Amino acid sequence: HDVRFKSYCGPDIRAWSAPVEDLSSWRDEGPIFTYPVGGQWDVMYAPDLVEVRRKDGSKEYYLYPHSRGRNREAMVAKGSRPDGPFTPLNMTDDGMGTVPGSTMGFDPSVYIEYVTDPKDPDYGIGFRAYGFWGFQRSSAGQLDQNTMYSLRPGNQAIGYFIPASSRYGVIRDPEGTEYPSVYPGQDLGSFNFFEAASIRKVGNKF
């Protein structure tokens, strides 16, 4: 884990766990994922891990460990436990890139929205999945629940989700960029997106 101790990240992802009743008591679960190709390892940047509860009561865990491929598309791996083992879902046969349709880019984050209304068209599958990603540009899109790495059929990615900044208060996106997900009248210079998207829901706010 510390073979690149002078760098931000190493060639594996390490997990820590704690009982929800005592978030001061953390346990090191050790390395849970690494990805060697041809005897070499890629660096694991800002990962995300989400739990999906299926309608039959089973749980699946989707790990978004880092970006691969010429277009910085995100690898997605699946496991039955949060500490692994994980199996990559969207890698090409040579392991060097991602398959067509892999939509998310640098430092991805995923949010799961559960559907409980029987009248909702997604009630049968039970959830919707949303992805967020980008480096010096914020993008987002609704994911296909069957793949968890491609866009949902009929949906397009939002190319500019929130404003990105080159330095505090200075927007780096092209002049005149529209942000369909930002409320009108907001100070666009206050968002300051750079990298490592991470979305959470607290109460009724995201």
Annotate each PLM feature.
Residues 1-206:
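Carbohydrate-active catalytic/glycan-binding domains of CAZyme proteins
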